[in-house]
């Protein structure tokens, strides 16, 4: 049953969209030779392009500069994520998952997505699966279907 939800299924698929939800979950949408897959991250991540960091988990949150209007601060992520989405779609050519559920996705245009499973063991780090059934849940010390 895990094989239907294995992150290795992303190999050869295209990352087509990245967005955040109101509760700060980042949704990575992949499509390709099979139905669309969704990777939802709740933990730290870093996206680099040709060695330069272009997006991180920290960029999700409102900046702490109190001189900046709140509405502008909340739009900051949309500005930062545009640097990434302007490089899409991009084909995934490498997938690595460590025994602690850190996940690394490498794309053909030198784009690299590193997801760090750094939440406490009782909290989900990331979730993966087909678009209509995102059930594979990764914790720092285990993976299971919900």
Predicted regions and their residues:
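Surface-exposed, interaction-prone regions used to assemble/regulate multi-protein complexes
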Residues: 1-146
């Amino acid at each position: 049953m895990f094989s239907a939800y294995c992150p290795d299924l992303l190999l050869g698929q295209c990352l087509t969209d990245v967005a955040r939800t109101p509760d700060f979950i980042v949704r990575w949408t992949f499509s390709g030779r099979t139905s669309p897959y969704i990777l939802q991250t709740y933990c730290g991540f870093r996206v680099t392009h040709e060695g330069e960091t272009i997006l991180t988990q920290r960029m999700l949150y409102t900046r702490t500069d109190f001189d900046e209007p709140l509405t502008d601060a909340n739009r900051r992520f949309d500005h930062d994520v545009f640097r990434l989405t302007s490089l899409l779609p991009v084909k995934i050519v490498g997938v690595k998952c460590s025994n602690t559920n850190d996940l690394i996705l490498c794309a053909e245009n030198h784009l690299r997505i590193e997801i760090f499973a750094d939440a406490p063991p009782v909290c989900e780090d990331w979730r993966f699966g087909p678009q209509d059934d995102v059930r594979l849940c990764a914790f720092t010390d285990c993976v299971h279907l919900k």
